Amino acid sequence: MSAAIVNAVKQCGYFNQGQCLSCRHIQQPLAQQVAVKTQTLLQLLAPFIPANSAELFLPPITGDDSGFRNKAKMVVLGAAHEPVLGIVSPSGEAVDLCDCLLYPADMQALLHRLTRFVQQAGLPPYRVDKAKGELKFILLTRSQVRGEYLLRFVLRSHNGIERIERELPALLAEYPQIKVVSVNIQPVHMAILEGDEEIFLTENTRLEERFNHVPLFIRPKSFFQTNPQVAAQLYQTAREWVAEFSPRSLWDLFCGVGGFGLHCASKDITLTGIEIEAEAIACAQMSAQMMGLENVQFMALDSTDFAKGKSAADKPDLIIVNPPRRGIGEALCQSLSEFAPKAILYSSCNPKTLAKDLEHIQGYHLTKVQLFDLFPHTDHFEVLAMLVKD
């Protein structure tokens, strides 16, 4: 990234007018944002860093400060004849976010087209204040490898499906890059993004992405990183760090669609991936098959329960953990300490819970830490930490 881009300040009309404050640090240069995040990380991990060992903190990895996001979660507001895709502003107004700077230009254009789609279909937006209407959210995910899309309509009931199906052929003819379309039924009058029922309106049910020549698949309910540019560097770094230990066996806990494990896998490595979301596991299995990996097992289980059910004899050479914001928890920390693999690679989206977990992982020391700025203009970031057995 050039210094000119790093030191520029993004001018966002939504933020300047107080309509959307999600990117709370957008008026700071990206370099300054990353410096603050780095200092936060240093302070949190200071208790685990030996004196004169600052070199284990590697330079932070950054990407573009606009056009990087691959997922849009749009609240549908307004009325059927004049829908608005975006958010409710702090003052309570409906704000159209189709031109949000975080989205690539082609994604912005498609969001505008989807606004017209809602209008043409006559889909009444759900009114929270009156508990009436049908269309709650439009969720759009973009694959960078081909610029293809997964489109989801979140409805209160089945009543709007026929209207969507009526207008869908024209939309798909205009945008053949929309490969997956589904309807999610969320009948509850609560601030819940999605329900249990997913109805596919296309034959294809998954979107293909590719990082560092590793095929990954996205289904409607599977978690996927929202910043492909930096995520690819995160996975590649993990691959390089793990390779230094030449493991013959790996566990990838909280594996999602398998991004970390599949990057580190080879035909000589036995890989076990654990993830509670069955859709994500189905995606990981598909990737492994496409890569021709045979010594791979992905299972839809709770990671902590999986570890509790294993004995020391089952331990792998190396364990990867990539938990949600809550961290891995004390019970799993204890299991990892008892298994005592050669190394533990911890990818964290919440350095506070990373620090808390490090207190409970016994018999290990940090050898490398690196910050990945997957979430520019916010307080959030990803951390990769390598722990090696004492």
From Swiss-Prot:
Recorded superkingdom: Bacteria
| Active site residues of this protein | C349
Q: Which residues bind S-adenosyl-L-methionine?
A: Q225, F254, E275, N322
Which of this chain's residues are annotated to bind [4Fe-4S] cluster? C12, C20, C23, C100
CDD domains attached to this UniProt entry: AdoMet_MTases
Name the chemical reaction catalysed here.
uridine(747) in 23S rRNA + S-adenosyl-L-methionine = 5-methyluridine(747) in 23S rRNA + S-adenosyl-L-homocysteine + H(+)
Q: What's the short name of a Pfam family annotated to this entry?
A: tRNA_U5-meth_tr
EC number annotated for this UniProt entry: 2.1.1.189
Q: Which GO terms describe its molecular function?
A: 4 iron, 4 sulfur cluster binding; iron ion binding; rRNA (uridine-C5-)-methyltransferase activity
Q: Which GO terms describe its biological process?
A: rRNA base methylation
Task: Relate the protein's function as given in its record.
Answer: Catalyzes the formation of 5-methyl-uridine at position 747 (m5U747) in 23S rRNA.
NCBIfam families, per database record? meth_trns_rumB, rumA
Q: Which family does the record assign? A: Belongs to the class I-like SAM-binding methyltransferase superfamily. RNA M5U methyltransferase family. RlmC subfamily.
Name by which UniProt lists this protein = 23S rRNA (uracil(747)-C(5))-methyltransferase RlmC
Q: Which organism is it from?
A: Shewanella baltica (strain OS195)
Gene behind this protein: rlmC
